[in-house]
Regions:
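N-terminal helical cap/lid subdomain that shapes the substrate entry/recognition surface
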Residues: 1-65, 78
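Asp-based, Mg2+/Mn2+-dependent phosphohydrolase catalytic module
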Residues: 60-63, 67, 76-181
Length: 181
């Protein structure tokens, strides 16, 4: 889990799980077979994911307030837009992914790129993050940050965030913004 904690939020190019597995086992494996099986299982699991509690309500409230919404992800554009499309989340005015920048999280470049795209000063923006690397990127960009851990990151130190919630459904957008003011 310690290895994954360091990797989460950085993007797939930072860590090779196959090499980690070979190192732990002490012998080589059929790389293509392992990667093919892993990819198939990953796709099955992803297809079952639903929108997290509170996300739709928060997006709707943000739109009602006239707030601009963006996505900053260390994942590939194909992966991100595929999930946004599948989940019916089309309300983001800007989506930036690892394909769009030289440096991914914990570097602030993704967040700075989204803020520039939205014409929002980083100090006026709020990042919702589930990883320590994402929180570090948001804070380095000069943003306020809310940690909302997922099952993989719930046990990690996310204390660098300005606020931690178990779920986005815990607070209305108005309450969240008030706590960050």
């Amino acid at each position: 889990m310690e290895v994954w904690g360091d990797v989460i939020g950085r993007g797939a190019s930072y860590f090779d799980p196959y090499q980690e597995l070979v190192a732990k086992l002490g012998h080589d494996l059929d790389r293509e077979a392992v990667l093919s099986r892993r990819k198939a299982r990953h796709q099955e699991m992803i297809a079952e994911l639903e929108v997290l509690p509170g996300v739709r309500d928060t997006v709707t409230a943000a739109k009602r307030l006239g707030l601009r919404l963006g996505v900053a992800s260390s994942s590939s554009r194909a992966w991100v837009t595929g999930h946004l499309d599948r989940l019916g989340l089309q309300d983001f005015q800007c989506v930036r992914c690892r394909d769009d920048v030289a440096n991914t999280k914990p570097d602030p470049e993704l967040y700075l790129s989204v803020c520039a795209c939205l014409d929002v000063a980083p100090g006026d923006a709020v990042a919702l993050e589930d990883s320590a690397n994402g929180i570090a990127a948001a804070k380095a960009a000069g943003m306020r940050c809310v940690a909302i851990p997922n099952p993989m990151t719930a046990g990690l130190d996310l204390s660098a965030a300005d606020l931690r919630l178990d779920s986005l459904a815990d607070l209305s957008l108005a309450e969240l913004l008030e706590r960050l003011a």
